[in-house]
Amino acid sequence: MVCMMMVLLAGGTYAQSDKFKQAMETNISSLDAAKSAAELQNVAASFERIANAEKTQWLPFYYAAIANIWKGFAAPKEEMDDIATQAEILLTKAEALEANNAEIFLAKNMASTIHMLVDPQTRWQTYGSKAAQDLAAAKKLDANNPRVYFLEGQSLFGTPVQFGGGKDKAKPLFEKSVALFDTYKPVNNLYPNWGKKNAADMVEQCK
C-alpha cells in the first residue's frame, strides 16, 4: 500500500510538472510572437496565472515581467511608469523564489531603464544609477551571459557621445553579445534565451 501511494504521488508530481512545462512552452512561444501591446498584456496575464497557480516557480513571474517590460519600452510616456512598476512587482516575487539570479537583475535593469526614459534628464541619477547597479550585479553573477552585453550596449547606444556613449562605444558590446550567443546554452528550454536577433540588429545599426 505504501509503495502504491508513493507511485501515485510520484505520478501526480510528474503530471503537474509536465503540465507546467507545456503551459510555459506555449506561453514563451506566444511571447516571442507578440507584436502588439494587447498581445503582450495577454501573455503577461497568462504567465501570471501560471505563477499564482504554481507558487514555487520563479520563471512565470519573470516572463510576466518581461512581457510588461517589452510593452513598456513601446508605451506612451504617460503609461511607462505604471508598466515598469508592475514589472518590478513581478520581479520582486520572482526574486523571493530565486535569489541572486542574473536574469532577474537584467530584467530589473530594463524596468529601471523604462522609468528613466520617461524623463532622462531628471531621472538619470536615480533610475539610471539603479539600472547600472543591476547590470553590474548581473555581470558579476554570470559574466558570460550574452544579454549582459546586449543591455550594456543598449545603454551606451542611447547615451550621447559627449557623455561617453554613442555607436562606436556600443558596437563592440553588441558584437560580443552576438559571439556569446553562439556558444550560450540556457539551463533548459524554459530558461531565458531571447536577445540574439536584437543584438545582431544593433550591430547593423552601429555601422
Where are these regions (language model features)?
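Terminal, low-structured helical/coil segments at or just beyond the last alpha-helical repeat
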Residues: 165-172, 176-207
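Amphipathic alpha-helical repeat scaffolds of TPR domains
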Residues: 17-30, 53-75, 100-119, 144-159, ...
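Bacterial Sec-dependent N-terminal signal peptides
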Residues: 1-20
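Canonical positions in the second alpha-helix
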Residues: 50, 94, 137-138, 177
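Hydrophobic, well-structured mid-protein blocks that either form specific transmembrane helices
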Residues: 81-133
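Helix-turn-helix repeat elements of alpha-solenoid scaffolds
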Residues: 32-46, 79-90, 124-132, 171-176
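Outer-membrane beta-barrel transmembrane domain signature
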Residues: 123-147, 154-165
